[in-house]
Every structure is written in C-alpha cells, then in structure tokens.
C-alpha cells in the first residue's frame, strides 16, 4: 500500500474511532440514567416561595416526559389532539418548531411518556401507540420511523408504550413486547433490524432500560410483564431473567448497576431487589429482596451505602441499607420522583411540592420546599437539572428555575 494511501487510511480510521468514543448521549434521568446530575455551586437552600422562575412555556400539550437540554436547545414531547409532537425551544424558552411523531396515548392518563434520547445530531423517541422515530435535532426532519405494533406485533398495554429509548454505538433498542419480537435492536441511522430477541414472550412493562458495560460484554436490562431481562447487546441473546412476585405488570423504574450489583425497585412486583451479576454477565444471584419498598415510577437514588426512594403504598419516603436490604428510616413526604445534584436530593411529589433534602447516611432532612402551582394535570414528570437551572415539566407547561448559587 502506498505511504500516502496508508496515511490517509490511518487518519480516517483514527477519526472514526475518536468520533465513536466521543459519542454524546443526552437522555432520561441524566447521562447514565441514574437520576444523578453532575452539577456544582447550586443553592443550598431556597427563599420562601422557591427559587426565581426564569421563564415558562405553556404550549407543550399533555405529557409526563422530561425535557432534554443540549448546549443550544431544549427538546420535549407532548400530545396535542391525539398526536405526539416533538417540541424544540431555545434556552430562553422561546418556541422554535414542533414536528409530528405519531399517534399518542389518549386513554388512561393521556399524554406523552417517552423522554427523547439525543445522540450527537439525532433524536430518538417513542409515541404511546408504538411509533419509534429518529429525527434530525436541528430541524426535526424525520430520518426513519417504525411501528412496534404493526412491524413487530407489539400488544397494546394498559398505559401505552412508555420507554425512553436506549442507544449503544450504532444501535437503538426498543421493546415491542411481542411474542416473537420482544426486544429489538435497530440500526440507529437507518431503522433496519440488527437483531430480535424473543425474551420470555411477555408484554412490555413501561420500563426505560439500562445499559451495563462489562469487559466481556454489554447487557441491555429491562422489564417485561413478569421478569427483569438481561440481553447481550451484540447478538440479542437472552442471558438471564429474574421473575417478579405477584401478577403486576407495571415496572417503570430504570435499574441501576454499580460495583457488580444490579438494584431495582418495582411497586407492582418484588419490591426492592439486589442481584449479584457474574463477572462475565451471564448469571445473576439474588442477594436480598424487600417487598415493603414499593416505588412504582418515581425512580430511586443510591448514594454510598443507602437508597432513597418513595413508597407508593404508604406515601412516605424510605432510606434503605444496600448491604442488608433493610429499611432504616422514613420521612413524611408524598410519593413522587427523586434526583441528586450537588450533594442534595431533589424530591418532587405528586401533590406538586418540590423540595430539597440533605442526605446524611441513614437519615435525610428537608432543607427547603415550594409548591408548583403552574401547569396542568398530574405531577408525574421527572425534573431535570442542567447548568444551574431546574427544569420542571407539569403537563402543558415547562418551568425553568434559577438554582445557581450567586
């Protein structure tokens, strides 16, 4: 091979490798889906009435999905007249454009569910009746779309397709929940099928999945109706499953992987569970299970040796020891979502109260709180913290609060 040609090949190959390794993913509950936002110099307490409201946008349509913020734009989807739209705003909350995604869920709790996933210059999102779409982030132009019901025989469930799509390399994953097409990997640039996993042949269960990266393999982790599934991202092989107690089918919370262990919480199954994952990722061993810890869709935060999460049955918040699985304390605060930023827990409950709490080992103490009075319908959406701004979606409204310490 001539030296010039060889040199050009090396430069192009190196550029491709660097581009692949620098892939920027903005998604549900932060960059790694743990609910932890890497922020600093945030307010340690709020004035009475809450932090300053920077702006409000009131035209989103119905929905419970969270916004995703880039360096220049904000993306969030909502339902208007039965259709799911992707909305684009600038960082001041000014409307830029909206584009149609597909038919949105309008039965039980009408509105968008799926938080968009943004990888470099492309957006991936799901609509409630099964559309999966790839859009150009700059203009909203559709690159491709598929229908999980028509194309993969996904059954219609009680609350609509809800997952926030997961991307790995050149693949985007979706869970139609069909008997023959349970989980599907698509080429994220073309929408063509990479592989199909039959799983256990069970209906999907509203979970936004997690990606576990090991030396031996990467594993796609999600829930079907009655089990947690671990699937090899390379070929779609089902590696293992963990059966749920009872007959519930709502397993919304994204699992967590840390230091060789998988943690998950479901209010409609086994409760809180810790699993040991083998080094090669092919087997799991149950460490403990606590059915009293029953968060349904508010997420949870693991900080050091403790998990902080809401109880959906008792409308309180639990602190759980991750070594033993025992509940070591609780506080009175209505059920809702939880995030962590700059060493403080951000709790947003279903009555509209937003609070910051200081976690101290097996305890947590409320520092400040205020009521979200703007917006419409249920307080379900998970807040987002980005560059010192707290973004709260409440139905048709997106609110931006200044929480940066001056």
Labelled PLM ranges:
Residues 270, 292-359:
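Loop/turn-rich, solvent-exposed surfaces of beta-rich toroidal or solenoidal domains
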Residues 54-68, 83, 98-117, 145-167, ...:
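Extracytoplasmic beta-rich repeat domains
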Residues 1-24:
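Bacterial Sec-dependent N-terminal signal peptides
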Residues 270, 376-406:
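Blade-level signature of beta-propeller repeat domains, shared across WD40, Kelch, NHL, RCC1
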Residues 30-33, 79-81, 128, 177-178, ...:
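Short loop/turn segments immediately following the C-termini of beta-strands
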Residues 23-52, 142:
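Blade/loop signatures of beta-propeller domains
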Residues 90-94, 136-139, 187-190, 232-236, ...:
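Short loop/turn segments that connect beta-strands within beta-propeller blades
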